[in-house]
Amino acid sequence: MRKLTSVAMLCALSVPGFAQADCGEVSITEMNWASNTVVTSVAKFIMEQGYGCDVTVVPSDTIPAVTSVAENGEPDIVTELWLNSAGEAYLKLEEQGKVERLGKVLDPGGVEGWWIPTYLAEKHPELTTIEGVMANPELVDNRFNNCPSGWGCRVVSDNLIRALDLEASGIEVFNHGSGETLASSMASAVQDEEPWFGYYWGPTVPLGKFDMTRVELGDYKPDVHTRNQTQDVDNPGVSEFPAAPVLTSVTTDFKEREPEVAEMLSKLTFKTDTMSALLAWMDKSNASAEEAAVYFLNNNSDEWSSWLNDDARERLASVLE
């Protein structure tokens, strides 16, 4: 499929900006889910072409990224940090003055939970509650599709599984090895109208593409959910997932070293609907994250122009011409 991008723009994504600013070396995470790869690609392009930074992308996941910041003070920037999944380890870093949240990278935020296909919910409405699922495990193919290791949602879901004694009800927990296999398991089931039960979050291509129904886990209990964010906690409980703040976080050293870039990152916010539409374009066009970043920058100057200072805006506009 023809990509709606230019060769020059894609080359610019892989080449640091000219020596046009005082920004030095910067490290930024890239998590292994679609929206985050787009956020990272957009931020990288702006930092390099608008601010002259030399950007290193660090492949990571939520928990390893927080651990790395705690132990090494790097990477400088953690993009798309899902606060509900980051756990107490991240909050301790804030208390210690090592990191600072700059702002919401998704507005109003994300949604996460345990889901079944809507066609399954319509056929078996009892499956819309966790009690109904556990009473009828065969209707969900006796399987729960869990997050990969290293994801914050894996910790929370593991604790929920223990608190519910889910496996005792006859449901096997399948721990996916990657976000790609988790997504493909949903896609394969929905396309064949087969049962599927598992964790997912949005904005994502699958939740935008497929009609899914959230399984009710009960009331949201802040203290229980906070406890469940700690791996292998002694007293896990059952709580619904709350609305999810999704942030950009930086080390305090980076904010002091590169205040203008930090200011830009504090304004770098995607409307959740905009991100969903961008991911849908990315999927339909079979595009890479870099190509999606180019597509966004070429078609949404009214959004990103307010993120940058005057000099950076002028530099970036000249690249996009």
What is each residue range found by the language model?
Residues 67-69, 75-79, 153-230:
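Ligand-binding pocket segment of bilobal, Venus flytrap-like solute-binding proteins
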Residues 22-35, 53-58, 141-145, 265:
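Short, well-ordered beta-strand elements
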Residues 112-122, 245-257, 280-281:
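A bilobed periplasmic-binding-protein/Venus flytrap-type ligand-binding module shared by bacterial periplasmic
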